[in-house]
């Protein structure tokens, strides 16, 4: 009986903690103040947990931690980018990772993500030329995956980063950002992976567009940007 009561108490506490993120409604216009590294967010928009070709990567991050909020313009940008990818990347499922909290400010284990204009995107992965989703389903643990300098997964060398799909998605993000009054201000990807990315057809287009990739990173920052690419945006109007 005591064990049952304890379980019910834990479930109740979890539901209370998750409730604000379960029943949240988007409305109005967001206000982002400051920078991704030192800012805040008002009237945040909650990213969709699932669409026809995308999904938020972790229910714990989404419902309990609440790191699924962005500026209203970025919300529409991400939504539009995935819609474009329905055409440019047919059959591919994408995973969105951590964004900002409801009011911005410090986010656990992140130095930025503070004003609703940053988002992490999971690297798409392929095995024998086809998308593999096995490692997309491990939630927060995905941040701990390691890819070597050529984009091979340390746990399974047959699994590699799909740089072509990544490039198509970044192009879609750039297109959508411009339509929604934003511009991509910075992309962070493990330095050693950039050459393979820019050698692809779509990587070359990204370079032609002048989208800025971080040129140098501290060792600690560099090593954790292999399983995802971080994108900062800036308001332009």
Mark where each language-model region is.
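Active-site acidic/histidine clusters and adjacent loop/turn architecture
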Residues: 30-96, 162-172, 176-178, 184, ...
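Acidic/His-rich structured neighborhood in mature extracellular/periplasmic domains
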Residues: 101-153
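Catalytic cores and adjacent binding grooves of peptidoglycan-active enzymes
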Residues: 130-237
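Bacterial N-terminal signal peptides
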Residues: 7-15
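Extended, low-complexity, intrinsically disordered C-terminal regulatory tails
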Residues: 77-108, 186-216
């Amino acid at each position: 009986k005591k064990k049952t009561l304890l379980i019910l108490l834990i479930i109740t506490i979890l539901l209370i903690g998750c409730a604000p993120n379960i029943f949240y409604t988007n409305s109005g216009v967001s206000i982002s103040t400051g920078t991704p590294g030192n800012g805040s967010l008002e009237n945040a928009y909650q990213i969709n947990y699932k669409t026809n070709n995308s999904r938020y990567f972790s229910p714990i991050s989404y419902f309990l931690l609440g790191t699924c909020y962005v500026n209203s313009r970025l919300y529409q940008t991400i939504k539009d980018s995935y819609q474009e990818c329905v055409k440019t990347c047919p059959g591919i499922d994408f995973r969105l990772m951590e964004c900002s909290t409801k009011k911005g400010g410090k986010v656990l284990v992140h130095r930025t993500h503070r004003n609703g204009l940053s988002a992490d995107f999971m690297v798409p992965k392929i095995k024998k030329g086809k998308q593999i989703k096995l490692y997309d389903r491990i939630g927060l643990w995905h941040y701990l995956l390691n890819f070597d300098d050529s984009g091979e997964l340390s746990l399974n060398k047959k699994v590699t980063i799909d740089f072509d799909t990544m490039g198509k998605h970044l192009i879609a993000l750039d297109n959508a950002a411009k339509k929604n009054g934003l511009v991509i201000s910075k992309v962070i990807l493990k330095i050693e992976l950039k050459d393979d990315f820019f050698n692809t057809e779509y990587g070359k287009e990204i370079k032609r567009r002048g989208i800025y990739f971080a040129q140098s990173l501290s060792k600690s920052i560099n090593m954790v940007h292999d399983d995802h690419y971080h994108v900062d945006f800036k308001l332009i109007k």
